[in-house]
């Protein structure tokens, strides 16, 4: 027998923690480092994404150029107006090397902290480039995406041709309506649009059916009207690996697009998302129900030149 050095209670030595504490006192005084498993006094614990770490492991996490998958810094919103789009671009087959990621960060963050890099377990030998949320205008005029993509190509990375990569676009929910009800109505029209024009969107995305089924599946819900489509999506039980991912609290994520390192294709994708959001916000359910793909394509304005050209290349003008 021995005594707990904290509360004085008698305990069997084999039941003691660290040879001196009862289990209750140990639980109140110590935590276990998520990374290395060492015991850490609560006064010395460092937290990252609400997980406990010892000082050494915490320093390693924060010093790394390629962050872990769960890394989520506070978002920095760039550009005036709405919506804001957060980009996740996966690149592969060039190595998950901090030196390579640093080269990309030096280009993207020359003016401001625009992007960061993360580990992604779905990739074979690469990482994910993630942007802070920004307006389409800011993405176009200020974040040097062409230089970022060119640098990735120069280092030997692939995105479209790897077969593993996606280009995901997060839309901030707050931009989709002033009230929760308005936001839900806008989201319903986006879901309905994807269901109604699935074949067209799949061609636009450059994904194969197999890739879409695995990473960005269709809900296959009712197309009677947008509200029924949203209801079907929410009760589908499909989780986050859907073309329109609704599981995030503050964003709607469009996951359907295949990764790309071609600047014009990248910008055409952002312009497509921006146009869809604009129409979903401003049109009624009835207008969405009667709209044809040709009518949608005809609304592409001159300032979305990359989208106009891309629709022509993909045979999606009608």
Predicted regions and their residues:
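Short metal-binding segments enriched for Cys and/or His
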Residues: 29-32, 36, 59-64
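Short, conserved phosphate-binding/catalytic loop or strand-edge motifs used
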Residues: 165-171
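Short cysteine-rich clusters marking metal-coordination/redox-active sites
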Residues: 4-7, 22, 33-36, 54
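C-terminal accessory/tail domains of diverse enzymes
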Residues: 58-161, 174-318
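Short Cys/His-rich "knuckle" micro-motifs
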Residues: 14-17, 32, 43-46, 64-65
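Zinc-coordinating Cys/His ligand positions in small cysteine/histidine-rich zinc-finger domains
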Residues: 12, 22-30, 41-42, 51-57
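Flanking scaffold residues of small Cys/His-coordinated metal-binding clusters
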Residues: 1-2, 16-17, 27-30, 48-49
């Amino acid at each position: 027998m021995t005594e707990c050095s904290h509360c004085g209670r008698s305990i069997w030595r084999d039941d003691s923690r660290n040879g001196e504490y009862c289990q209750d006192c140990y639980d109140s005084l110590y935590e276990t480092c998520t990374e290395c498993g060492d015991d850490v006094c609560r006064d010395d614990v460092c937290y990252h994404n609400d997980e406990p770490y010892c000082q050494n492991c915490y320093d390693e996490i924060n010093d790394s150029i390629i962050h872990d998958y769960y890394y989520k810094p506070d978002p920095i919103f760039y550009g005036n107006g709405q919506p804001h789009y957060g980009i996740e671009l996966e690149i592969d087959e060039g190595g998950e090397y901090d030196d390579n990621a640093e080269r990309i960060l030096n280009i993207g963050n020359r003016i401001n902290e625009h992007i960061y890099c993360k580990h992604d377990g779905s990739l074979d030998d690469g990482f994910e480039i993630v942007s802070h949320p920004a307006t389409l205008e800011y993405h176009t005029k200020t974040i040097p995406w062409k230089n970022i993509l060119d640098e990735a190509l120069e280092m030997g990375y692939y995105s479209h041709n790897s077969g593993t990569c996606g280009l995901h676009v997060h839309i901030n929910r707050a931009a989709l309506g002033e009230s929760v009800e308005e936001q839900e109505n806008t989201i319903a029209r986006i879901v309905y649009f994807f269901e109604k024009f699935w074949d067209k969107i799949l061609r636009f995305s450059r994904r194969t059916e197999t890739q879409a089924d695995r990473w960005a599946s269709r809900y296959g819900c009712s197309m009677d009207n947008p509200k029924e489509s949203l209801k079907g999506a929410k009760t589908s039980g499909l989780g986050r690996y859907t073309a329109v991912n609704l599981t995030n609290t503050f964003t709607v994520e469009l996951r359907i697009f295949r990764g790309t390192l071609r600047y014009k294709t990248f910008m055409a994708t952002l312009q497509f998302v921006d146009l869809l959001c604009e129409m979903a916000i401003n049109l009624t359910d009835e207008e969405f129900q009667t709209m044809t793909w040709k009518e949608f394509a005809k609304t592409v304005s001159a300032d979305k030149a990359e989208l106009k050209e891309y629709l022509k290349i993909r045979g999606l003008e009608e």
